[in-house]
A protein has these predicted regions:
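Short hydrophobic/aromatic beta-strand element in the GNAT-like acyltransferase core
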Residues: 45-49, 60, 74, 139-141
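A conserved beta-turn-beta hairpin within the catalytic core of GNAT-like acetyltransferases
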Residues: 65-73, 82, 134-139
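Conserved GNAT acetyl-CoA-binding A-motif
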Residues: 98-111
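Conserved acetyl-CoA-binding loop-helix of GNAT-fold acetyltransferases
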Residues: 83-96, 121
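Conserved N-terminal entry element of GNAT/NAT acetyltransferase domains
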Residues: 1-18
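A conserved beta-strand-loop-helix scaffold within acyl/acetyltransferase catalytic domains
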Residues: 41, 52-53, 61-75
Length: 147
């Protein structure tokens, strides 16, 4: 590997705009590096939705399966539907699909005001808590063995 002396490089460009091109470029560079150093696996989206007769989403779960893992990104239930086990059914459907795809584990993170008890009640185990996030809250990280 050729080392570059960074002392002769010009100033860093610092942004606060979240430019999609900048994010894409760094993501692609990191992905290229990662693929050279780990086994190949494919990220496959998974979505489970409850919609009304017009197609309006009332509840849903989105995520991806990646190798051995179901990674849950978002789970939302309309307030008028909460308390009817719809979240449980969405989660169970996503986990069943992940098992069909060969996943052994699930991962999710949630804020303290969202659903920590929900995930614990479904067999998820807390593995990490990010304190004072973003200022006074907590962000909880959970995993679960699917098999």
């Amino acid at each position: 590997m050729k080392m570059i002396d960074a002392s002769g490089i010009g100033p860093f460009r610092i942004t606060s705009d979240g430019d999609a091109r900048d994010v894409h470029d760094i993501h692609e560079l990191l992905k290229e590096y990662n693929l050279r150093h780990r086994e190949a696996s494919q990220s496959v989206p998974v979505g489970v939705f409850l919609e009304d007769e017009t197609g309006q989403k009332l509840a849903g779960l989105t995520g991806e399966t990646f190798g051995n893992w179901l990674c849950i990104q978002y789970l939302f239930i309309s307030e008028q539907l909460r308390g009817q086990r719809i979240g449980s059914k969405l989660l169970e459907a996503a986990e069943a699909e992940a098992k069909k795809r060969g996943c052994k584990y699930a991962f999710v993170d949630t804020f303290s005001f969202q659903a920590p008890a929900f995930y614990k009640n479904h067999g998820y185990r807390e593995v990490f808590t990010l304190e004072e996030y973003p200022y006074t809250g907590k962000r909880h990280y959970y995993t679960k063995k699917l098999f």
